[in-house]
């Protein structure tokens, strides 16, 4: 029965190692501990090429007895010399500092402080105007003066007047657009609340303007106003309360409605404040942009319908039925709502053709003036007649003081059950309101050329302004992008200008809403039309060609639902559709990043030539499946189908799969459905006798813990092996193939009469019995065929190696390493042997560090060394087994070592140092031939190594 566990195989290969000496900490740590065993197996498999009985010691300096070496456990060499007692041709190696006991941070050295006194230093990010400890808490009048006047003095009052006029005009226009329709004035119950809506709007503007201008906002000239997108939610709240309370109790309806408005502002402010305090400003950016566009489109359609209602002066709201449509197309009514629609469309076209910031304000200043000139010029036309016919607002609607809306509050008349029924609308209003700050703040910063703005600070400012606004009986507000940009560019980029604008707005509030009685209805309708058209254009026209078809369909669905059904329902449907389409899109992208053959992608272990030749042929039995992204029910089924298809395809091609490696290094997480899928995959592979190896699992993640425990851990794991990285997985699979190859190779060489050539006697007794138990199968037939092909190529050189065995080292070693690739005869290499010196390395001994001057190259006779390549962000290690050369490219090219090399096991090595190399060239009359041959061999070996690293990096690390 084959051994599936690496610890079980280790007990057969190395009986002297106690598997229970290391305490278990977790399943993954147990599997990672097998990595050292994999390296031992790589070294043992490579050491097959060295026969201690036929390859005697090299020189009288090192009278090494071969019997001192225990080849069953390479880590237990008995050496005659330590490196501390070598001759001048040997090198002093220091114990490696790269081990488990080395601290991550060096010990802090004590130095005398040479720094100047702390009070004379300016610390980073420390304000130059920060008060000293003695003056902390005092209010400096000079700083207040600097805060408001910016070193310009009292003349700043005069300089700010144009900007204040522009800001005040914008507030008036917004009041007519937003404030006048704060309540659904088309309904008879709310018909007379237009003036109160204006007053509430102005109070909200004043509160937000004071908060921003007194230091709440980073922008000195920011302008606060009501958010037009909240109007539909306010109307929804009003109608919800009206339906719950009934039309027969108007006082309770109005009291409950206005209280709900204030509570929604407080709720919005608290959410803003909490997000800012917790520094979660970027959290809002994760909300899908196309859902926001759909909501904006829904608001735009609502504003268009509201403009029709306000302009037509019909009782009730516009409905999609025959009675409402027939009333709208009465001649006089049609003229009332079609004229502002035509003007707003023409104004939108003009704005696209001539995008000047003062175009719209100028129109709404000049157009009413022209209107009144025409009224005065037309005989028989009077203002009272226009009010009676609905062309100008009635004076009865505005004959109230500005503070009248406070009289509408009444806790006694408030219907608390109806108020609770509006909580969903409040939450939707809050949710929609907080989406605009992370959009407007960066947009304004870019327009003003500012590099950095603290969004969290702006959220806190919005939290304060909205909470205060709700506390004083007003509604939501935010920093408007358009108004702020026009105000700043008009010269209002200072905090004094914001204070002056707030005071001017207070004056406008105190004057009262009587001015409304002189405003044409079509002016307000044109404003509302213009806003609605712009929002519809932003949501339905601008995304064409930018968004995907699915996203655009979602936008249209949200707009339609908000227009026909309900605003809250529209938002919910949009979120549901976004989630569904996200699952569909995520499922369409395969989580399987790629499938790579082990014949192309190899581990970074440097092995002898014949083993590399064998792995190039048999490596197809190893397949690496690299996964990426988040694994969930939508993607894991595709992975399962691909794995089943891969196995079937390889079986049909007479190249059956033996090892499947699944790499999780690029996987972010997994849900529970993935666990069930991998249980099925594991059972399928076990049925087909395919070894499953997984790597890259992050034990710190809860989803991976569940996956590891249920699928790859426990006693019933179907022989699954877990490794730290894909390199260790590949090394393990290659070692298993090489271990079987070693068995076939020994038997084939024995039949061919080479039983004592290069094999170690008595080493494979256990393995032969294990190999003989293999049942005939296509994968083992392929293994035998490749082994026979490799051994056939190898036997061509075996007769030479038998001849070389009678020579002293390092000549046999040099011929084994370079014999297959060199173009020179034996006498060439015999002449080089005296310049190589033998040395012994203990485990952990340091050969050289990265960046050191290249002073030697090393040929491994036994054991293994590890080369660590450390880049800026990534690191890669290469295990180098015996019969391999180390450091040849830096040595001959005279460039610094590019890796740190440490003895991974006790090793016997042959060293050619710089002094020996130069002596070799000086003492030979064929120095140029020697140099060219060594450079040729170096380039050839580097090419093979480069191919391995390139395939590994491009396929598995991309």
Curated annotation (Swiss-Prot):
Membrane topology: Multi-pass membrane protein
BP terms from Gene Ontology: basic amino acid transmembrane import into vacuole
Keywords attached to this entry: Amino-acid transport, Membrane, Transmembrane, Transmembrane helix, Transport, Vacuole
Pfam families: cNMP_binding, STAS, Sulfate_transp
Cysteine pairings via disulfide bonds: none
Compartments in which it is found: Vacuole membrane
Residue ranges of the TM segments: 153-173, 199-219, 258-278, 291-311, 327-347, 358-378, 426-446, 499-519, 521-541, 543-563, 564-584, 627-647, 659-679
Gene Ontology molecular function terms on file: basic amino acid transmembrane transporter activity
Outcome of gene disruption: Decreases cellular and vacuolar levels of basic amino acids (arginine, histidine and lysine). Small vacuoles.
Domain STAS: start-end pairs: 612-733
CDD domains recorded: CAP_ED, STAS_SulP_like_sulfate_transporter
GO cellular component, one term: fungal-type vacuole membrane
PANTHER family attached to this UniProt entry: AFR304WP, SULFATE TRANSPORTER YBAR-RELATED
Function: Amino acid transporter involved in vacuolar uptake of basic amino acids for storage.
Additional note from the record: C-terminal GFP or HA(3) tagging interferes with activity.
Entry protein name: Vacuolar basic amino acid transporter vsb1
Species whose genome carries this gene: Schizosaccharomyces pombe (strain 972 / ATCC 24843)
Lineage: Eukaryota, Fungi, Dikarya, Ascomycota, Taphrinomycotina
């Amino acid at each position: 029965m084959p051994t599936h566990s690496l610890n079980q195989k280790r007990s057969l290969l190395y009986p002297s190692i106690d598997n229970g000496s290391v305490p278990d900490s977790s399943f993954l740590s147990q599997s990672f501990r097998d990595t050292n065993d994999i390296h031992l197996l790589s070294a043992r498999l490579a050491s097959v090429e060295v026969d201690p009985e036929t390859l005697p010691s090299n020189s009288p300096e090192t009278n090494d007895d071969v019997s001192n070496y225990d080849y069953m456990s390479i880590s237990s060499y008995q050496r005659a010399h330590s490196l501390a007692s070598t001759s001048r041709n040997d090198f002093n190696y220091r114990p490696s500092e790269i081990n488990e006991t080395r601290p991550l941070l060096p010990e802090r050295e004590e130095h005398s402080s040479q720094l100047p006194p702390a009070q004379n230093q300016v610390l980073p990010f420390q304000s130059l105007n920060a008060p000293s400890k003695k003056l902390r808490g005092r209010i400096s009048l000079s700083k207040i003066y600097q805060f408001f006047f910016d070193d310009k003095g009292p003349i700043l009052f005069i300089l700010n007047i144009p900007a204040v006029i522009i800001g005040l005009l914008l507030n008036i226009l917004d009041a007519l657009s937003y404030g006048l329709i704060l309540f659904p004035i088309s309904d008879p119950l709310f018909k007379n609340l237009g003036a109160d809506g204006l007053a509430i709007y102005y109070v909200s503007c004043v509160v937000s303007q004071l908060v921003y201008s007194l230091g709440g906002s980073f922008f000195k000239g920011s302008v606060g106003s009501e958010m037009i997108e909240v109007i539909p939610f306010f109307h929804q709240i009003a109608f919800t309360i009206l339906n719950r309370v009934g039309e027969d109790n108007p006082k309770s309806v109005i009291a409950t409605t206005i209280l709900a408005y204030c509570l929604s502002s407080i709720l919005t402010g608290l959410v803003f404040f909490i997000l800012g305090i917790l520094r979660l400003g970027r959290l809002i950016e994760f909300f899908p942009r196309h859902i926001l566009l759909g909501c904006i489109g829904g608001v735009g359609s609502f504003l268009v319908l509201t403009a029709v209602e306000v302009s037509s002066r019909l009782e009730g709201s516009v409905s999609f039925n025959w009675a409402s449509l027939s009333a709208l197309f009465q001649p006089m009514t049609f003229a009332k709502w079609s004229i502002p629609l035509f003007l707003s469309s023409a104004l939108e076209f003009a704005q696209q053709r001539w995008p000047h910031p003062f175009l719209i304000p100028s129109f709404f200043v000049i157009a009413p003036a022209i209107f009144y000139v025409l009224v005065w010029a037309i005989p028989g036309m009077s203002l009272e007649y226009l009010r009676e016919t609905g062309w100008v607002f009635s004076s009865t609607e505005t004959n109230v003081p500005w503070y009248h809306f406070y009289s509408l509050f009444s806790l006694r008349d408030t219907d608390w059950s109806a108020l609770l029924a509006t909580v969903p609308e409040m939450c939707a209003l809050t949710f929609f309101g907080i989406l605009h700050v992370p959009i407007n703040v960066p947009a304004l910063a870019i327009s003003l050329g500012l590099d950095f703005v603290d969004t969290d600070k702006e959220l806190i400012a919005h939290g304060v302004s909205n909470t205060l606004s709700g506390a004083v009986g007003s509604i939501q507000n935010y920093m408007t992008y358009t108004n702020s940009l026009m105000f700043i560019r008009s010269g209002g980029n200072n905090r004094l200008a914001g204070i002056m604008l707030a005071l001017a707005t207070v004056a406008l509030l105190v004057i009262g809403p009587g001015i409304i009685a002189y405003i044409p209805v079509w002016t307000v309708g044109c404003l509302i039309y213009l806003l609605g058209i712009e929002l519809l254009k932003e949501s339905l026209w601008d995304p064409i060609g930018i968004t995907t078809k699915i996203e655009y369909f979602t936008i249209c669905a949200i707009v339609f639902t908000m227009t026909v059904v309900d605003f809250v329902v529209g938002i919910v449907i949009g979120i549901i559709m976004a989630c569904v389409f996200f699952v569909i899109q995520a499922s369409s992208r395969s989580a399987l990043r790629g499938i790579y053959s082990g014949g192309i992608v190899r581990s970074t272990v440097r092995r002898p030539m014949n083993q590399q030749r064998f792995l190039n042929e048999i490596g197809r039995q190893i397949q690496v499946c690299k996964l990426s992204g988040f694994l969930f029910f939508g993607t894991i089924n595709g992975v399962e189908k691909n794995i089943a298809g891969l196995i079937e395809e390889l079986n049909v091609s007479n190249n059956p799969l033996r090892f499947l490696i699944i790499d999780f290094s690029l996987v972010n997480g997994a849900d529970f459905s993935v666990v069930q899928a991998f249980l099925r995959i594991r059972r399928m592979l076990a049925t087909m006798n395919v070894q499953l190896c997984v790597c890259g699992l992050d034990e710190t993640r809860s989803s991976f813990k569940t996956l590891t425990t249920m699928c790859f851990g426990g006693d019933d794991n179907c022989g699954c092996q877990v490794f730290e990285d894909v390199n260790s997985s590949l090394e393990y699979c290659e070692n298993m193939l090489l271990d079987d190859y070693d068995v076939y190779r020994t038997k084939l060489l024995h039949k061919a009469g080479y039983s004592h050539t290069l094999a170690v006697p008595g080493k494979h007794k256990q393995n032969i019995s294990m190999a003989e138990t293999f049942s005939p199968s296509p994968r083992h037939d392929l293994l035998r065929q490749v082994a026979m092909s490799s051994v056939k190529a190898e036997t061509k050189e075996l007769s030479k190696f038998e001849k070389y065995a009678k020579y002293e080292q390092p000549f046999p070693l040099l011929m084994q390493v370079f014999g297959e690739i060199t173009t020179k005869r034996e006498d060439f290499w015999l002449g080089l042997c005296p310049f190589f010196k033998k040395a012994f390395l203990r485990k952990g001994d340091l050969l050289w560090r990265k960046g050191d001057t290249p002073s030697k190259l090393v040929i491994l006779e036994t054991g293994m060394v590890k080369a660590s390549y450390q880049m800026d962000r990534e690191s890669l290690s290469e295990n180098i087994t015996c019969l391999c050369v180390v450091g040849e490219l830096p040595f001959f090219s005279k460039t610094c070592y590019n890796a740190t090399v440490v003895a991974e096991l006790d090793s016997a090595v042959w060293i050619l140092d710089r002094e020996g190399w130069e002596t070799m060239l000086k003492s030979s009359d064929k120095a140029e031939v020697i140099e060219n041959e060594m450079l040729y061999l170096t380039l050839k070996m580097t090419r093979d190594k480069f191919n391995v690293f390139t395939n590994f990096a491009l396929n598995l690390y991309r």
